[in-house]
C-alpha cells in the first residue's frame, strides 16, 4: 500500500465544534498520523495527514463534513511528498 501525505485547509464553521478532537479520533481509527490545529483567523483548521492512501482519503472525506455542529465550506488539499515523520496524531496549538 502506497503511503501519502496531504496538507489540508478546512474552512467554514470549523472552530468551537470539536473539529480537531473529532479529526484526531478519526485519524487514529484509520491509522493516519500527523497533526491538526486551528488557525488564528477563527474559521480555518489546518492539518497534515500521512499514511496509506485509502486511509488518508477516508479522513479527507470525513473532513468535508466534519463533526456535528460544523459547517464545512471548503477543503483545500495539497498533496506533498511523503516524509514518514510522525509517530502519532496530535492536536497542535493555534497559529
From Swiss-Prot:
The active site is at residues 20, 38. Its EC number is 3.6.1.7. Gene3D superfamilies: 3.30.70.100. GO terms for molecular function: acylphosphatase activity. The keyword Transferase does not apply. It holds the Pfam family Acylphosphatase. This is Acylphosphatase. Residues 5-93 form the Acylphosphatase-like domain. Belongs to the acylphosphatase family. Keywords: Hydrolase. InterPro entries: Acylphosphatase (IPR020456), Acylphosphatase-like_dom (IPR001792), Acylphosphatase-like_dom_sf (IPR036046), Acylphosphatase_CS (IPR017968).
Amino acid at each position: 500500500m502506497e503511503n501519502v501525505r496531504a496538507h489540508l485547509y478546512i474552512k467554514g464553521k470549523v472552530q468551537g465544534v470539536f473539529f480537531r478532537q473529532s479529526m484526531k479520533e478519526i485519524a487514529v481509527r484509520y491509522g493516519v498520523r500527523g497533526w491538526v490545529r486551528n488557525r488564528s483567523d477563527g474559521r480555518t483548521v489546518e492539518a497534515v495527514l500521512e499514511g496509506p492512501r485509502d486511509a488518508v482519503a477516508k479522513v479527507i472525506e470525513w473532513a468535508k463534513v466534519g463533526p456535528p455542529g460544523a459547517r464545512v465550506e471548503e477543503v483545500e488539499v495539497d498533496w506533498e511528498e511523503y516524509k514518514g515523520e510522525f509517530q502519532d496524531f496530535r492536536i497542535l496549538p493555534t497559529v
